[in-house]
Amino acid sequence: MVFGEFFHRPGPDEELVNLNVGGFKQSVDQSTLLRFPHTRLGKLLTCHSEEAILELCDDYSVADKEYYFDRNPSLFRYVLNFYYTGKLHVMEELCVFSFCQEIEYWGINELFIDSCCSNRYQERKEENHEKDWDQKSNDVSTDTSFEESSVFEKELEKFDQLRFGQLRKKIWIRMENPAYCLSAKLIAISSLSVVLASIVAMCVHSMSEFQNEDGEVDDPVLEGVEIACIAWFTGELAVRLVAAPCQKKFWKNPLNIIDFVSIIPFYATLAVDTKEEESEDIENMGKVVQILRLMRIFRILKLARHSVGLRSLGATLRHSYHEVGLLLLFLSVGISIFSVLIYSVEKDDHTSSLTSIPICWWWATISMTTVGYGDTHPVTLAGKLIASTCIICGILVVALPITIIFNKFSKYYQKQKDIDVDQCSEDPPEKCPELPYFNIRDLYAQRVHAFITSLSSVGIVVSDPDSTDASSIEDNEDVYNTASLENCTAK
């Protein structure tokens, strides 16, 4: 018996509602169900058409006035007890999420759970939420890696319909999957080396030995390295573009966009240098060239093509924009509050460097992020107390969203590793053969037809081959058994 359940005997004048839930039949007073009109059973009594009734139950018998529900009959006892007592108790034998789904189906809010079960229910729900988060993340990683692998296989199938499809397919696989074969690994290592060489050359070019009063000095060695790197980047992008199965999808890939952006500054600088000789506005052209040269730093993003960690970081930031937004919001509020407070107590001290609110913004930023350069600091006692509070609040504010972001990064990192493992096999996986199609109705009809034919072959005439009367079949079986017995006796 359900905890708190009691027997309710309807009055003689009360109309009963017949319920059949998974084979468990119960008659309930209408007044009992109407105590909670917003639940499923309460809404059922307000329906005025059969269509409306069938939207709330699985079936309805007009003759018996009985409502059928294909739900858990054991849990329905708890639901029925809720209508009698007004309190819902948790079914211990049922999973907490299944229980939640069941009461949601019946339209019962969790707020009706009695106090004796509420705390235990919430604890089990939170505990299962944590377990479900880990399991769901692993399942999502596996499922997503399988889906992306399936997308990659579909892209490979497109090459069969393209011109020079097999050649383009081989090139595409080696360019996209560094672990596919030895040649693919060599291409990936070469590309990574060129990216690192380009970054090193850019950093060396900024040293004082390569600077003069007019600007940078064109060193022939560094210039040769730059041209060689750009030639490699351009050739790599061109090969990927030519071998791609779909041009539109190619330009939607962020990694391909990064490859294109990384070579734009070089060619734009060449164009500006060419026009600089013909243009009179040399100063403005020089600034444009400097800006374009600074854009070469975007080449470091090309490492994302060869780094699982960078791709995971990008996916984490893309899917954690809510947490990142909260982090920025918390920091902005804290910086605004503490900058005004520190300014109000430090402005009258002539030895303090916190003389304006914008300067206090900088101080509050490096204090809340626990960087603490030391270039600006409070000198008064009240200012130091405010600074201590600012640092403590900064630690708490930054730590809260960072934990969530770190957990997501771990999951996406594992997902990217699963994708790389799935795509590193030398031979694409074979397609699973399609399962044979069987029509059970046709098979049954063929068996019945064969049975009727066998009856005719032994001298039994079936008057109506399409008849499905069970009595006629039994009579035929008796005749068939009698004929068989006579044959055996004769032998």
UniProtKB/Swiss-Prot annotation:
GO annotation (BP), single: protein homooligomerization
Transport keyword on record: yes
Key words, A-Z: Cell membrane, Ion channel, Ion transport, Membrane, Potassium, Potassium channel, Potassium transport, Transmembrane, Transmembrane helix, Transport, Voltage-gated channel
Cytoplasmic side: 1-182, 244-254, 307-321, 414-491
Location in or out of the cell: Cell membrane
Keyword rRNA processing carried by entry: no
Gene Ontology cellular component terms for the protein in this record: cytosol; Golgi apparatus; voltage-gated potassium channel complex
Main location class: membrane
Residues in the Extracellular compartment per record: 205-220, 276-285, 344-357, 378-384
Alphabetized InterPro entries for the sequence: BTB/POZ_dom, Ion_trans_dom, K_chnl_volt-dep_Kv, K_chnl_volt-dep_Kv5/Kv9, SKP1/BTB/POZ_sf, T1-type_BTB, VG_K_chnl, Volt_channel_dom_sf
Pfam families xrefs: BTB_2, Ion_trans
Example GO molecular function: voltage-gated potassium channel activity
Motif (Selectivity filter): 370-375
Intramembrane segments as residue ranges: 358-369, 370-377
Membrane topology: Multi-pass membrane protein
Segments traversing the membrane: 183-204, 221-243, 255-275, 286-306, 322-343, 385-413
Similarity field: Belongs to the potassium channel family. S (TC 1.A.1.2) subfamily. Kv9.3/KCNS3 sub-subfamily.
Subunit and partners: Heterotetramer with KCNB1. Does not form homomultimers.
Role summary: Potassium channel regulatory subunit that modulates the delayed rectifier potassium channel activity of KCNB1 by namely slowing down the deactivation and inactivation time constants. While it does not form functional channel on its own, it can form functional heterotetrameric channels with KCNB1.
Comment text on domains: The transmembrane segment S4 functions as a voltage-sensor and is characterized by a series of positively charged amino acids at every third position. Channel opening and closing is effected by a conformation change that affects the position and orientation of the voltage-sensor paddle formed by S3 and S4 within the membrane. A transmembrane electric field that is positive inside would push the positively charged S4 segment outwards, thereby opening the pore, while a field that is negative inside would pull the S4 segment inwards and close the pore.
Name assigned to this protein: Delayed-rectifier potassium channel regulatory subunit KCNS3
Gene that specifies this protein: KCNS3
